[in-house]
């Protein structure tokens, strides 16, 4: 909307988010249903929780125009693509699976920013030639939003995001819960420095949303969890044995990888 890429932006949400977004000038219109939101749309973007995808795809299939391009923003792809294939029918050939790598621990209209996608990755996961052609069209719009568009196989996507998003979120929630259950929880909240705040930032995200994501990609997440358990066992064992050399070895291995992120 801020970049004048659409003549009209219509949104729908089961709760009040669409109406709040309209009040804040983020939408031109808050629709009363999925069907109303899809009516006359050239582009339909689905940003609902993963468990709701099958039902929403079915509603879109019965209300989208025959030339409307459909995409989604789900954090998992394999199950969402399967749901789309089952529910969209002929409209599946006009669907491009997507995942913008943007956002924060905040959610809702209050977290909206015009520059949210600037210089951020937006992954597209087309499964056939028809979707690949549409992905090129969609990429033009996403690039105009400032995003850097790349394509990726859906199974590779889910394995990668289990590694550096889904499991890390589960781990940070668990760490935060462990601190919260300790006798010094309140003092930890009051006196914690930047290290703890940085480490646990994503633990302030929506618990319901992330439970759905982790369970939807549970096989890949469990593989990551098993590898973490091995690493944690090394750390705990080294601490218990007062083995500084082994502890430094594990810490250095982690530090070398972390430096690559920056």
Name these PLM-found stretches:
Residues 34-69:
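Rossmann-like NAD(P)-binding element
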Residues 26-34:
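Conserved SAM-binding strand-loop segment of SAM-dependent methyltransferases
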């Amino acid at each position: 909307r801020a970049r004048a890429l659409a003549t009209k932006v219509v949104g729908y949400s089961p709760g009040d988010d669409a109406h709040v977004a309209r009040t804040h000038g983020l939408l031109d219109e808050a629709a009363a249903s999925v069907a109303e939101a899809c009516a006359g749309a050239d582009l339909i973007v689905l940003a609902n929780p993963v468990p709701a995808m099958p039902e929403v795809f079915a509603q879109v299939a019965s209300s989208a125009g025959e030339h409307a391009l459909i995409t989604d923003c789900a954090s998992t792809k394999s199950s969402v693509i399967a749901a789309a294939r089952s529910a969209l029918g002929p409209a599946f050939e006009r669907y491009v699976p997507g995942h913008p790598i943007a956002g924060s621990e905040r959610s809702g209209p209050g977290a909206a920013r015009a520059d949210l996608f600037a210089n951020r990755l937006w992954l597209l996961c087309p499964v056939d030639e028809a979707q690949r052609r549409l992905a090129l069209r969609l990429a033009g719009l996403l690039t105009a939003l400032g995003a850097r568009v790349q394509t990726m196989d859906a199974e590779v996507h889910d394995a990668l995001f289990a590694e550096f998003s889904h499991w890390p979120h589960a781990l940070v929630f668990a760490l935060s819960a462990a601190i919260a259950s300790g006798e010094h929880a309140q003092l930890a909240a009051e006196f914690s420095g930047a290290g703890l705040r940085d480490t646990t930032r994503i633990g302030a995200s929506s618990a319901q949303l992330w439970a759905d994501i982790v369970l939807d990609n549970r096989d890949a997440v469990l593989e990551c969890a098993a590898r973490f358990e091995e690493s944690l066992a090394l750390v705990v064992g080294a601490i218990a044995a007062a083995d500084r050399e082994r502890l430094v070895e594990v810490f250095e291995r982690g530090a070398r990888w972390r430096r690559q992120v920056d």
